[in-house]
Structures are given as C-alpha cells and as structure tokens.
Amino acid sequence: MSVKGRIVTDMIRFFTAQKMLGPKIQDGTLRKNLVEAPWHCPEEYINLPIHMRQFEMELLTPKEEDCGEVILQLHGGGYIAKIRNAYRDFAVRYSRIKGYRVLSVDYRVAPEHPYPAAFQDALEAYRWLLYSGFTGDRIILAGDSAGGGLVLALAMYLRDQGMPLPQKLIMMSPWTDLTASGPSYQENYEKDPLFGNTRESMIYSGEYLGGHSPKEPYISPLFGDFSKLPPMLFQVGGIEMLLSDSISAE
C-alpha cells in the first residue's frame, strides 16, 4: 500500500473508532442524525424525481449528449441506510463517461422494511425501465456494498424468470455473503478501516433478513448460480472484510 493509501486508511480507522460507528449504525442513530444540505444538480443535467408506490427514484438525464443507455444504480448502506448525496454525485460521474442516463433507486430499508423489500424495489425499478422503452441490452446495473449484492441477486432473478438481462453488471465491494463466512471476515478484521474491529457493524446485523436464511441466493447471491449471467466487473480492496465476497464469486 502507498504512503497516501496508508494515511487515508488510518484516518478512516481513527474516525470510525472515535465516532463509534458500529453501535450507531446498528441502532439507527447514525441514519437518523445524518442531515445533508440540499443537493444541487449540475446545469447540464435534469434530475427528475419519480414516485413509485412504495419507494422513490431519481432519473438523471443529460440535456445534450444522451447515448441512449441507462445505468440502474443501487446504493450501499448495509440495507439499513437510505440514499445519500454521494450517490447523486456518483450518478453525475457515471453519466459523464458516455452520456448515460442514471436511475438511482432509494429502496426501502431495514429494520422497518426487511427482505424482500429492497429486492422487490430493485426489481420494480428494472421493470419500470423496461416499460419505459429500454431494452435489456441498453441497461447496466451498478452498485456498491449492499447495492452490489442487490445487483447480482437481481440479475440472477431476471435470468431465473426468463426476463431480459442487462448489458453488464458493475459491483464495487459487493456484499454477496450475509453469512459473513469468507476468510476475509477473519483475516481482514484488524485491517478494514471502516467495518473492522467491531462485531456491531452492519455486516453482522441480521435486521435485513426478516426471518429468512442468509444463504438464500437472492439474499446472499454468493450461494446462487452464476451461469448465463451478463459480463460482470468486481472491484474490491485487498484489506476489506468484504474481499471474500468478490473473490469467491469469481
């Protein structure tokens, strides 16, 4: 790891320990007390709020260069955190790559809405894109952490149901194993600056399961069937507790 990387890692670890993020994540304090300033959409974009029956979405559209493809973004947060402004910024960055539209899904979260709420919302968002005229080969699924797990679970469900598959899957540090059984959960326990050194982090929270087995493939897609899925990109850091969730999937 570079000197710059070590400095950033140490800063994250210090902040996490000082703020006791593990307990605050688990009891909902962090989610309830985190207030953000209003997000300002760049002038070259239109950010359209879309009100679904049980959740909200936002469609970011470039005013000029529209490539005709769309990225369905599923945010992270351990299935207990709502969408934040950082993901709106991510949407802008995604769009600027090629002129993509970006549909960001503010899916329902636990503990108020355990599984399958978030999964159902992701599926409904994908169906909304199909009904809106996008073919599967013009849809890209992207997500990080819990959102990355949702991306993979959704793709497996679409294949199982014979529905149009997306063009590709992009997953950053996806949470694909809610049993936390991979070796990196132990090997990187002292190294991970965000989730390490606490058994009270979101990784060990069962609030999302809602009485279901953590080995169900649409909950932990690591235990699912990877055949006949679209091309997949996994990105994960070597010191993350979620490292095994990507390596084992490959």
PLM feature spans:
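A glycine/proline-hinged amphipathic helix-loop "lid/cap" segment
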Residues: 1-65
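Alpha/beta-hydrolase superfamily serine-hydrolase fold, recognizing
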Residues: 51-250
